[in-house]
Amino acid sequence: IGLVGSEMCIRDRGGIVGVLHQNPEDCVEKHVEDTLTAGAGLSDRSTVEYISEASDEVINDLIENGVDFDRNADGELTFTLEAAHSIRRILHAGGDATGRGITEALCREVRADENIVVMENAVAAELLVDSDQECKGVIVYNELTGEHEIVYTSALVLATGGLGQLYKYTTNPDGATGDGIDLAYNAGAIIQDMEFVQFHPTALALSPESKDRFLISEAVRGEGARLINNHGMEFMSKYHDKRELAPRDIVTRAIYSEMNKEHKFNVFLNASMIDHMKLFKRFPTISKRCGECGIDISAKPIPVAPAAHYSMGGIKASVEGRTSIRGLYAIGECASTGLHGANRLASNSLLECVVCACLLYTSPSPRDRSVS
């Protein structure tokens, strides 16, 4: 129910974590420690370990299902660096269009499966939960007919994304209004960690009035771009020894501090030191969007400011997607599994989506259990 291939994942211009055997310098232990550190020690270690260990298998499943991850001239997967990662382990598709690459490949599989009925132009209005706290279905509003319909279910999965549109400035699409969390809350599900909302440090900020904040992936900083203030001075060394590659919450607070000092609505991201051919090949979507705004990212700094980006909190769920209501499951950003703690590590979100979806699908007798 809903729009297949909606913008939530398509907008992901970062990548997906892959702790793979093809990358001998990396290991599960390193990824786990990076995740726990970024999450301010509030992540659930067992969840982090499980999802990290599963990454090799699910990445290869994605490849088998048609996701074309970027490779070098020798045909080997290329790994890139993003903030708070201790090693290059991020996979991309189409340079800076990883979310689109994964979503479009999986949507093709969905539409080709005769056993899957897709209901688009339909909005979930209310969950049907009985007196025993078991989900029996959902009331759906059909936007084409203007009528409400009841869909009875043996298992219902919420994968409704985040809530960035609750904020003035956000990188999220219009549909990111937290509706899935609201549906679950009204049905009596346990909601947790809603105080933890991540602000991405670098969203395109052309003016204070511009509310559509196009995401400038931190992968640009991973390739060497530097943050500068309105006087052209670098400043991140004052805030953290990893500079631009510090955890997102630290970089965001540093940018806000510089903006407040100068009474400005933005700072700038200077990518001119990156090889120009590499820059345009690696970030085609970003360079195109900035070009449409009159910014040649190889020569001119990009105006950026923090914007609401990701909710760590949501519907309390296990890694299999089980919630406190039997028969109701939640995966992705609307769920809160304990993976992200207080601050999500870059590119862990797509990995969580895929791992939890696979585990939900393969779990035996899911209806018999719930999360307390």
Residue ranges and their predicted role:
Residues I63-E147, Y152, A159, A203-S207:
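Conserved redox-cofactor binding core of oxidoreductases
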Residues T47-E53, L91-A105, T171-P173, G178, ...:
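Short beta-strand to alpha-helix junction loop
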Residues Y310-A330:
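FAD-binding beta-loop-beta segment adjacent to the flavin cofactor pocket
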